[in-house]
């Protein structure tokens, strides 16, 4: 298992539906499988409003793992722990050589100004 920390800025959070963020770059010959995500929201003055959930995906949030609620709507510092459930089988889709990305599932969050620390634990499987 591997761990990585990624901090999302306010501008990245506000564009998370239109511009998903790469958490782990693609690795040739490897399949990346997320296991756990710890979210740490660093509130500044205004909470975000979201129109949907967040999702981690392989190359795209449309091919993703379980969607989850983001802690960025809290009026103070907040934390959340998410584990992932997945059962994907897609004909003609290649799982390896794809990055792990995070995005908002329906609309961009609005209104907030804090940052979000993401601590991702994932498997790196050689195929």
Describe the role of every protein-language-model region:
Residues 1-13, 105-127:
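C-terminal interaction-tip segments
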